[in-house]
A protein has these predicted regions:
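PAPS-dependent sulfotransferase catalytic core
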Residues: 59-74, 105, 125-153
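An alpha-helix initiation/capping motif
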Residues: 104-111
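PAPS-dependent sulfotransferase catalytic domain
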Residues: 1-98, 111-126
Length: 153
């Protein structure tokens, strides 16, 4: 006598997109990424070291003065690249074509980029409102130096 059981009846897989759609209705996806992953990794490394995440802040409690750490930057580049690859696979697996926005486009022309995203989402800014840009770049000469140094290896 064997100890076999009948396999459970297969049910259609419920995806995370299905779950989100059930709760939120029609979904539209905006994929924000940075073309220059080394610059992104450098900014991330500095923030990890200083605990400074927003313009106008100083080194936060527990933070330290930034110092070049090639190993950390390399690990962060790899993390960013894996994450971007994972998003590419996830979007493709769900037949999703997101609105692609790069940090570089957003930083160069925030109002235009925001309007493109709103258009993609089918949203209008109410007539009595306007888009206000509050973004300030945190990158400085130290970022530029670290980027150059990392890319030269």
């Amino acid at each position: 006598m064997t100890n076999e059981r009948a396999a459970p009846a297969s049910r259609p897989a419920v995806t995370d997109v299905d779950l989100f759609s059930a709760q939120l209705g029609r979904l539209r996806f905006v994929h924000l990424r940075r073309r220059d992953v080394v610059a992104q990794a450098v900014s991330w490394a500095k923030s990890l070291q200083t605990h400074f995440w927003h313009p106008g802040e100083a080194v936060a409690p527990g933070g330290e003065d930034p110092h070049y750490d090639e190993e950390l930057i390399g690990r962060l580049v790899a993390t960013i690249e894996r994450s971007e690859a994972d998003w590419t696979v996830w979007f493709a697996a769900h037949s999703i074509v997101p609105c692609e926005v790069t940090y570089e486009e957003l930083a160069a022309d925030p109002p235009r980029t925001a309007q493109e995203v709103l258009d993609y989402l089918g949203l209008d800014v109410p007539p009595d409102r306007q888009l206000v840009v509050r973004h300030r770049r945190q990158a400085d000469q130290l970022n530029a130096d670290w980027i150059t140094r990392f890319k030269s290896h």
